[in-house]
A protein has these predicted regions:
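Glycine-enriched, solvent-exposed interface loops adjoining structured elements
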Residues: 1-234
Length: 234
């Protein structure tokens, strides 16, 4: 649906739910409830996909948000070529990224210069990193590297990605040639297009979710004005 169609659906469904007893709703107010419903829908989808994995601090590949599910229109892939030298556990590869609209990082892959591509990295929370590095079963290896992330205050609160491959100085050195970052964008903030202006912003979630979002927005609106509706009925 376009944003105009979502507004029309909001008013139609609202009348079915009893909103004809309430004075007219401004487009700006409908936008507020639509955006709240969009954000709640996205977070619920993410929660159902990764909640169990995040409880243990590790996000495995099987639990990641993929572009074939409900958030496929928000799925992004960014590839960065690496030209620096070798990296080891005591000097891991670090990359500062400037993605301001990221809702959730889902997957990381690295390429080696010898031709080995798309080696999946395990995402470890920073507070679990020390245990992962010293544990024989979870420590990083060339074929199962580890990625951790944190926000660097000195870098204007940009995200720092740290990659560890378990290599030591005596190893045959494998050079990291590139890194692929997969993430979910925040959804767009929808805005009604006032006649005569070209400021409308449509919902960028898949079409089949739009009706569910509108219905959730109406329910949120009714919940916010339910005392008023009760008074009018009396």
């Amino acid at each position: 649906m376009t944003i105009q169609e979502m507004h029309n659906e909001f008013r139609t469904f609202g009348q079915v739910m009893g909103l004809q007893l309430v004075r007219g709703i401004l487009p700006e107010s409908i936008d507020v409830y639509l955006n709240a419903a969009i954000n709640e829908t996205v977070r619920n989808i993410i929660s159902k996909n990764v909640a169990n994995s995040l409880q243990v601090g590790i996000l495995p590949q099987a639990a990641s948000i993929t572009p074939i599910n409900a958030l496929r229109t928000l799925y992004r892939v960014h590839h960065t070529d690496i030209t620096e030298s070798y990296y080891f556990n005591d000097n891991p590869f670090e990359l500062i990224v400037d993605f301001h609209n990221v809702l959730l990082y889902t997957d990381f892959y690295i390429d080696y210069k010898d031709g080995k591509k798309d080696v999946h990295c395990r995402l470890i929370e920073p507070d679990r990193l020390s245990d992962a590095l010293t544990d024989y079963c979870t420590r990083p290896t060339i074929n199962e590297p580890i990625v951790t992330m944190f926000t660097e205050v000195a870098e204007n609160y940009l995200t720092v990605i740290k990659v560890m491959t378990g290599q030591i100085e005596s190893d045959d050195k494998k050079v990291i040639d590139g890194i692929k970052i997969c993430y979910i964008d925040n959804p767009k903030i929808v805005k009604y297009n006032v006649e005569g202006k070209n400021e409308g912003v449509d919902c960028d979630l898949p079409e089949y979710l739009h009706e569910e979002i509108v219905q959730l927005a109406v329910k949120k609106y009714i919940a916010s004005i339910s005392p008023t509706m009760s008074q009018q009925k009396n």
